[in-house]
Amino acid sequence: MKDYYAILGVSREASQEEIKKAYRRLALKYHPDRNPGDKEAEERFKEINEAYAVLSDPKKRAAYDRGHLEAPEYRPEDLFDLFFQEVFGVRGHRRPPRGEDLEAEVEVELQDLLHGAEKEVRYTRLVPCEACGGEGGRRTPCPTCRGQGVVESYRQSFFGTVVTRTACPHCKGRGYLLAETCPACRGRGRVPREERVRVQVPPGMDEGHLLRVPGYGNLGPGGPGDLYLRIRVRPHPHLERQGPDLVYRLRLGLAQAALGARVEVPGLEGPIPLDIPPGTGHGEVFALEGGGLPLPGGRGRGTLRVVVELAVPKKLSPKAQKLLRAYAEEVGEEVAPEGFWERLKGFFRK
């Protein structure tokens, strides 16, 4: 994964204002118009815009910081639009804007992450209103900007006349006003619609990972945005996840721990036999290599760690008590005398 902070030359703790300032400085320095024919500067410009597109969005930045964001893909026109918007305050080349990106959740079972799985996700996105064709109503050109969406202001400087283009405040950069509002969408031009999309969840995905589905965000005049699916892993009844490794807490009886036993532990592909050697103590760990989840880059699988927890019985039958007392006497361990606790309880009841 690229280091977007290094690309912009800022620290991981940088504020949004510091990130924006660094972006503007670098974007102006490496803009293709200032470096004609320089392929290296062109690639640098793309990287700078890609880094800013992620770090300027709080949600994407948080996911990136956790290592849960897939490498985004941007069209060249998107990067130039971002440059014009952030540096000059207007959209470059007057290209219609894409729809907004969306975020939804996809729930998976722990077993799904072993080989990957196809999942269907339901979510709601905005689509063009059929009643008005997505126009929001009957349009009329904005008289302030004459349908251009931008206004120009002029000022004299030492270098001559400086022209500044900004979004038209009257129509908010749209270039038109609504003479009549569509009742179906109330002038918004878009209406919500429930959608379904089937996605392939790759093996070994982390909890909270953002899975990008291009073109399934809100629809806008310039095309759709993207859909980001946040991975949610349902808790397993027996196994805990620790990265690519799994943990199973095995409760052993005193006799099993002392004498040894053959047990079965739950695995993602079925029960796994495990031989417990005599004299196993509380907290001992047995590592079953390859019993975990897939490692990044197809480098095998993690480990299933079996942690022993001794189950001390709270109640014993008279026969079991007798056997344990005989064992304690054999090994020289001092225990409470027979009937001690009953006599003590009776004392406090008086």
UniProtKB/Swiss-Prot annotation:
Keyword Chaperone: yes
Start and end residues of each J domain: 3-68
GO process terms (BP): chaperone cofactor-dependent protein refolding; DNA replication; protein refolding; response to heat
GO terms for MF: ATP binding; heat shock protein binding; unfolded protein binding; zinc ion binding
Cofactor dependence: Zn(2+)
Residues at which Zn(2+) 2 binds: 142, 145, 168, 171
Family: Belongs to the DnaJ family.
Domain notes: The J domain is necessary and sufficient to stimulate DnaK ATPase activity. Zinc center 1 plays an important role in the autonomous, DnaK-independent chaperone activity of DnaJ. Zinc center 2 is essential for interaction with DnaK and for DnaJ activity.
Name of the featured protein: Chaperone protein DnaJ 1
Recorded name of the encoding gene: dnaJ1
